[in-house]
């Protein structure tokens, strides 16, 4: 299955471009720069007009880690129950609780296929117990209603899902009781495992000062403008929608032959110890500089290699599992509410991982 993205809706104004530029600029400013570089800044970022190709491989419930990421908000905190003594009603409640614990946990749309058993902390997880699929009340129309506001339309069926991604031992989940998960779970929560293939015309500009430290420190400071283009990404990613927020993380390479079969704790431990994947598969960088001596040009090459490596590291640390980004859409609802009721509006800051 695949779907089309109205990419032009993302670039209708410059808000998203400016947000990404600000994020990258902040990340680069945190770097410890080598002695031959100073004043590094991201001056421009454009998503471009060419959208990525996205093919759906699997549809199911969001990873447990995403729910854990939302438990910090006050509305998700549940009051603690106090023991009031031996009472018949309490005994009945205990029996109901035990019944709930024995019930089915989270399942996926495809019977026998469960969620990836990933652990954000990188520690090995206990052996997963197969979950009985619960009745799904999401129809194709309801799925379409979730994606429609974001300009996403269901399209024709894509290529077949790789065998290793549909292996039951590969897709598994920790057992979560209905009693524990129900307060957090919503019927509109959904997660897509997708093949993300991007070969667009995204570009960004970086301005940096090249320093010549001979015959004395900072003897020459030469501004250089670098153009980064032709970025290619081809990986398996997860896109989850829950609590009016979208979670995005890249899981593994499309043709990653090193992924073990998840049939025992040893294979799970092997995977969780692996480093996050390198998201960028290809990148091109060009320097804009005047006539200079050959030794300065050699330093320009060092600057280019440094920036490319740091950009790869930033994306790997922020977007590759067990890390993810969260796009909080509650801000949009609050802005609309403020416009409708300006006298009753209040400012709230949302922070996502």
Swiss-Prot record:
Residues 64-75, 84-103, 330-342 have a biased composition (Acidic residues). It is found in: Mitochondrion outer membrane; Endoplasmic reticulum membrane. It is a peripheral membrane protein. Its main location: mitochondrion. PROSITE patterns: SMP. The keyword Endoplasmic reticulum applies. PANTHER family: MITOCHONDRIAL DISTRIBUTION AND MORPHOLOGY PROTEIN 12 (PTHR28204:SF1). The SMP-LTD domain is a barrel-like domain that can bind various types of glycerophospholipids in its interior and mediate their transfer between two adjacent bilayers. This is Mitochondrial distribution and morphology protein 12. It comes from Candida tropicalis (strain ATCC MYA-3404 / T1) (Yeast). The lineage of its organism: Eukaryota, Fungi, Dikarya, Ascomycota, Saccharomycotina.
